[in-house]
Amino acid sequence: MAVQKLYESQSKLFQPIKVGNMQLQHRMVHAPATRLRCLDNGLVMTDLVKEYYKQRSSIPGTLLITESLFSGAKSGGFSNIPCLYNDEHVEAWKPIVQAIHDNDCFVFIQFWNLPGELKVDYLEDQERLEKVTQGECPMDPTGLPAALGSAYSICGEELYVDKFMTKQDIQEHITTYTEAAKRAVFGCGADGVEVHQVNGFLLDKFVLNGYGDKCDPEYCGSLENRARFCLELLESVVNAIGQERVGYRISPFSDIWKDKDSFEAHVFMIKKIKERFPNLAYLHAIEPRQYWNGHVHITQEKNTLIYKNLWGDPFITAGGHDRDSAIQMAEQENTLVAFGRYFLSNPDLPFRLKYNLPLNKWDRATFYTKMSPKGYIDYPFSKEFLDTKKVE
């Protein structure tokens, strides 16, 4: 194949765009996706994970958003999830961030908080069990079971759900989240962080009334109260690292908490965030394609564009996109498209999409294979991409 210059295209998907402080060379983004390639104690497997991100930053000017990290010891209780709340964690992530930057790419580190869920075998360790009994564990606004009444992780592991969340607990979460953001940017050298209000997890649970009135009265009841935790956390993070280094992710079509006011809640949040933080790097929204109850196809009436129009620029859309839908969505002003599964199975994805090359199919069975290189760093680059490297 005679390969033309990579970004010569009429489609906006392949054209440069400025996001926050970053000058990207195209509008295809690596979406955050949990992959469990981490030690049981939260320490990332540096060599393995570095190779993964090195491969996926092979096209200069790409923005990569990492899998979600726990910001503190009380942020969650799943095993094999990376953490960033001490110096050892920072030192483990530094080479990963550096590898991305060495490829002239950019990285935002995402943080999440679980709503009080602990994996049951996580408690088999005596030291951990003592911490749980002393209240040093992931917290929930209510102490109620996990989403939809099921207490199981993404791997089908049984979960233990813990304690009511006080105002003091909320303030502690804000502090640990902010400290983690500072570690990400000033310690690891990341370009920014992404705040995670998605899929029924802790911040989402507050906004979508997942706890009813079983919480501190300042943080429940009215929509203004329910939004308070997120807005206070966002303000703290922004004050610590700057608006341009912060992105915000939502899942407006998730029905985890079956909140009849979900649309109004997301509209309220977007307006408040835009009003208070007009220079935020981006808003990142998940399409109604892939949720717990199966595959939902995008329609003209049901997609994220209404939220994009409320927000303005820049805007990232994610969720089940293929090449055609990505090109279509990128025609919207200052819109980027994030890929999760396709970026996993195609380390040179922006190149393949540019030249309409066949895509590797992902292997779902290896998505959450703990600490394994299989289905993680063994997907092949395209021959055409490798040929361009020979020319260089």
Swiss-Prot record:
Substrate binds at residues 196, 199, 368. FMN binds at residues 34, 196, 249, 341. The keyword Cell membrane does not apply. It holds the Pfam family Oxidored_FMN. Its EC number is 1.6.99.1. It comes from the Eukaryota. Keywords: Flavoprotein, FMN, NADP, Oxidoreductase. One of its GO terms (biological process) is cellular detoxification. It is an enzyme of class 1 (oxidoreductase). This is Putative NADPH dehydrogenase C5H10.10. It comes from Schizosaccharomyces pombe (strain 972 / ATCC 24843).
